[in-house]
């Protein structure tokens, strides 16, 4: 029985890539800077001391980081016995965004340039805004700018509740984000508005990767909170991913846990499981792994590393999240059967010590574990698509156009 379990620690980069200068990210290192802060006692907030990731270390994380950066992460064990295969991978795609990273992991790098809304104020074309107001029968809109998602709620959340005007905002990513109150505006109404925005962006040729619904609750600035009902409307990948090939060619199954299905626009997904928060995502993943049959991929995105700690530049929170993940990792490893493979990876970096709030262009870890996987270094990989090609070979689908089999 062949099964693959893919765990994406969203934004868990392990050191700047060779082309990081193109992105202003030279020196970024999500893992390294978190470990450094922990070793200095600067991340003792509900947790304490050096970053403690013994299980990820056994799978080769510290070695992969050393391969990427040339140094051992502060306070971590560079001499631990490694029981998995490990690599550090460079991104071939032109961006450092979520869809590009995930699609490339599945064998389809993004070699075109996304469209972006580059102006920090008055970010969106008036023609687009006018169409959204008319089609969705809106009283107007707020925002129309670049912003952090939590900051803009404090700035405009109360006005939104009073006026019913949705909050439109963007970032350095190829996104159009819409924040609305779940109760006063309504979740269904927000989703409908996002569908309209997706249609207009596609028909208008803006080439925007995602429209993101950002529902929130609360009654005043300071206590607004985003809920777990986020919904991403992505464009479809430009070619069949290994997920699609497994389903189409082998009548296999692909189980999405968390936001995976949204990222792939539901292409190649046979089952969707929703969960919010690290523990809930872990629990849902364990349940699906126990039930998974032959020719199945269980694919989970642990978004909190990115959304809760990376973008918010919360080093202590990121460290605590990693340690929680590491404590629970043996539960996953125990479910890996004789012919199964477990792959732990990321989709980009988001160094919580870095300036600004955006992603960082970094190598990602590729940690592969299974009874038949030979432990040791798989070296530097030129593309995340090596993961997709490895899966294509493993399941016996037609080969991907990009990437090399690692096993």
Curated annotation (Swiss-Prot):
Binds 2 manganese ions. It catalyses: 2-deoxy-alpha-D-ribose 1-phosphate = 2-deoxy-D-ribose 5-phosphate; alpha-D-ribose 1-phosphate = D-ribose 5-phosphate. It comes from Salmonella typhimurium (strain LT2 / SGSC1412 / ATCC 700720). GO terms for molecular function: magnesium ion binding; manganese ion binding; phosphopentomutase activity. One of its GO terms (biological process) is nucleotide metabolic process. NCBIfam families: deoB, PRK05362.1. Belongs to the phosphopentomutase family. Its EC number is 5.4.2.7. Mn(2+) 1 binds at residues 10, 347-348. Its cofactor is Mn(2+). HAMAP family: Phosphopentomut (MF_00740). Isomerase that catalyzes the conversion of deoxy-ribose 1-phosphate (dRib-1-P) and ribose 1-phosphate (Rib-1-P) to deoxy-ribose 5-phosphate (dRib-5-P) and ribose 5-phosphate (Rib-5-P), respectively. Keywords: Cytoplasm, Isomerase, Manganese, Metal-binding. This is Phosphopentomutase. The gene is deoB.
């Amino acid at each position: 029985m062949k099964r693959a379990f893919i765990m994406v620690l969203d934004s868990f980069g392990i050191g700047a890539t060779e082309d990081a200068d193109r992105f202003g990210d030279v020196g970024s290192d999500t893992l390294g800077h978190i470990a450094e802060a922990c070793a200095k006692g600067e991340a003792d907030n509900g947790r304490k001391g050096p970053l403690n990731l013994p299980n990820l270390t056994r799978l080769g994380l510290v070695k992969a980081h050393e391969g990427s950066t040339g140094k051992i992460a502060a306070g971590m064990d560079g001499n631990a016995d490694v029981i998995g295969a490990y690599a550090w991978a460079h991104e071939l795609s032109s961006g450092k965004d979520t869809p590009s990273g995930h699609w490339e992991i599945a064998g389809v790098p993004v070699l075109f340039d996304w469209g972006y809304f580059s102006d920090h104020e008055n970010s969106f074309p008036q023609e687009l805004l006018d169409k959204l107001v008319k089609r969705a029968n809106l009283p107007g809109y707020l925002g129309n700018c670049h912003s952090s998602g939590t900051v803009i709620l404090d700035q405009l959340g109360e006005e939104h509740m009073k006026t019913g005007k949705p909050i439109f905002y963007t970032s350095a990513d190829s996104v159009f984000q819409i924040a609305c109150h779940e109760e006063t505006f309504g979740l269904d109404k927000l989703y409908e508005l996002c569908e309209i925005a997706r249609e207009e962006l596609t028909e208008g040729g803006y080439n925007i990767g995602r429209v993101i619904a950002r529902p929130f609750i609360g009654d005043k600035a300071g206590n607004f909170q985003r809920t777990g009902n986020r919904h991403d409307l992505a464009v479809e990948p430009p070619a069949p991913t290994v997920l699609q090939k497994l389903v189409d060619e082998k009548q296999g199954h692909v189980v999405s846990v968390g936001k995976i299905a949204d990222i792939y626009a539901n292409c190649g997904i046979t089952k969707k499981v929703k969960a919010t928060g690290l523990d809930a995502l872990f629990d849902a993943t364990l349940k699906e792994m126990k039930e998974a049959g032959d020719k199945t991929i269980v694919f989970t995105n642990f978004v909190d590393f990115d959304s809760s700690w990376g973008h918010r530049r919360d080093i202590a929170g990121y460290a605590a999240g990693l340690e929680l993940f590491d404590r629970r990792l043996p539960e996953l490893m125990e479910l890996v059967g004789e012919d199964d493979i477990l792959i732990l990876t990321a989709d980009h970096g988001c160094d919580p010590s870095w300036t600004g709030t955006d992603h960082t262009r970094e190598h990602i870890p590729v940690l592969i574990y299974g009874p038949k996987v030979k432990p040791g270094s798989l070296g530097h990989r030129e593309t995340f698509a090596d993961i997709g090609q490895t899966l294509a070979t493993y399941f016996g689908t037609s080969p991907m156009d990009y990437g090399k089999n690692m096993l």
